[in-house]
UniProtKB/Swiss-Prot annotation:
Catalytic center residues: E233, C267
UniProt KW Mitochondrion keyword: no
Organism annotation: Neptuniibacter caesariensis
NCBIfam families (UniProt xref): SulfactDhSafD (NF047626)
UniProt family annotation: Belongs to the aldehyde dehydrogenase family.
The name this protein goes by in its record: Sulfoacetaldehyde dehydrogenase
Gene: safD
């Protein structure tokens, strides 16, 4: 088996380079180095870690355009999307620096239960050790910083495994981390072969795994990890609900931004649209009108809104889901056009609620519309999926918003916004097969730490 792999630009298949997998012996050496680095990390003060993360934020800002260009070349996402990603990565680094200074324990009196004994408990948060951070292709730098930042802030060491498609951007990111002051025995980059993944996940020197990606890979990680702490951010089948009192102009803009941006390749994309019957035709017509004007093409051009999906295989999967929906009775309001790895923005009507495109995660620029009469009608349809990440609703009725908040199986409901809403200091994560644990810098620090108690 070859120890190298080649990468191409999804837009035009131009070569991006040839890279080497990390041999198993090197992985073991990296883990030994990181285990040794835990000792020095424990002696590094929180304000020192915060200083490193602030320096990293400054470097990310300085190299933002260079990194955004790499992201676009690697993933096919538009340069506009990549620039937004770099802004988010900068924010995540700043937030990690701020939260590094806020890791605080508590003291507890023991007299709440008899016999009290006059003791006091001092509870502190301690790092887990070495965190294996695994990131997907679609937000290679932003998600990496959402893992590396809080892991480092908490005092852990990090083995960073990016998606293979993102090798060049990951190499630049690690270089910037070193330049910011992270020692090499605190952060290592690896690109293991597929055959080595299970034993890497099971390795005794990996103390926890922080993974963002698909459910199948997460199942393999869980099976190999044993009793390791897991933070899993997985897929979503996120609904956007438009009530008859919702702002249609804002709702159509949100639908487009939360579905067709990044060519629909985001776990929090608006993958299913539920439109109240009283405004269905008006919403559909406005949505089709706006979507038909989106520029599809070269992702390096500033006016391009939709680039290619990550590869031809991904495009074929989306096409299959669309064709199955049409076979199930759906009609095409817009799109259903394909060119290489391009899937043109597609809007489907009359979609069966049991069609695969409504039940499974569709990772591409396709938007199924469902007309409904009442909230009670759609709650079981929305919940009829293995996922439960986020949701969005457009309504002026607080009672409706609260009912959806209580009844939907999701981690977040965004009122008068799309399901893709996320900011660095909010908790992020879902229920069911959308994952385990919560990201968001403060919450991720807790996930990658444990409590240690001194009784005196």
């Amino acid at each position: 088996m070859s120890n190298t792999y080649s990468l191409v630009n999804p837009f035009d298949n131009s070569p991006l380079g040839e890279y080497e997998y990390t041999p198993w012996a090197t992985l073991e050496n990296q883990l030994a180095m990181l285990k040794e680095g835990q000792l020095s990390q424990r002696k590094t003060a929180a304000f020192q870690r915060a200083g490193v993360l602030n320096k990293l934020a400054a470097l990310l800002k300085e190299h933002s355009e260079e990194m955004a260009t790499l992201i676009t070349q690697e993933t096919g996402k538009t340069i506009l999307d990549s620039r937004v990603e770099m802004m988010r990565a900068y924010n995540a680094a700043i937030a990690s620096a701020e939260e590094a200074r806020q890791i605080q324990g508590e003291s507890l009196d023991s007299d709440a239960y008899a016999p009290a004994g006059g003791k006091i408990g001092v509870v502190c948060w301690k790092p887990l050790g070495t965190i294996l951070c695994i990131t997907p292709f679609n937000f290679p730098i932003n998600i990496a910083i959402h893992k590396i930042g809080p892991a480092y802030a908490a005092g852990n060491t990090i083995l960073f495994k990016p998606g293979p498609q993102n090798t060049a951007s990951a190499q630049l990111l690690v270089k910037l981390c070193y330049e910011a002051g992270m020692p090499e025995n605190t952060l290592q980059l690896c690109m293991p072969e597929f055959s080595d993944l299970d034993r890497l996940n099971a390795h005794p020197d990996v103390n926890a795994i922080n993974f963002t990606g698909g459910t199948a890979a997460a199942n393999a990680i869980s099976a190999a990890a044993g009793y390791k702490k897991l933070l899993l951010e997985l897929g979503g089948n996120d609904p956007l609900i438009v009530m008859d009192d919702g702002d249609l102009e804002a709702a159509t803009t949100a639908a487009i931004n939360h579905r067709f941006a990044t060519a629909g390749q985001r776990c929090t994309a608006a993958k299913r649209l539920f439109i109240h019957a009283n405004v269905y035709e008006a919403f559909r017509d406005l949505l089709v009108e706006k979507s038909s004007k989106l520029v599809v093409g070269d992702p390096m051009k500033d006016d391009t809104f939709v680039g290619p999906v990550i590869n031809q295989g991904a495009a074929d999967q989306i096409r299959t889901l669309i064709e199955q929906a049409i076979e199930d009775g759906a009609s095409v309001a817009l799109g259903n056009q394909y060119e290489g790895a391009f899937v043109y923005p597609t809007i489907l009507e009359n979609v069966s609620p049991t069609s695969e495109i409504m039940v499974e995660e569709a990772f591409g620029p396709v938007m199924p519309l469902y007309k409904f009469e009442s909230v009670e009608e759609i709650i079981p349809i929305i919940n009829n999926t293995a996922y439960g990440l986020q949701a969005g609703v457009f309504s002026q009725n607080l009672a409706t918003i609260k009912e959806l908040y209580e009844q939907l199986d999701v981690g977040t409901l965004a009122a008068n916004d799309g399901p893709g809403f996320r900011t660095e200091h909010f908790p992020f994560g879902g229920v069911k097969e959308s994952g385990i644990g919560r990201e968001g810098i403060k919450y991720a620090i807790r996930e990658m730490s444990y409590t240690k108690t001194l009784v005196i």
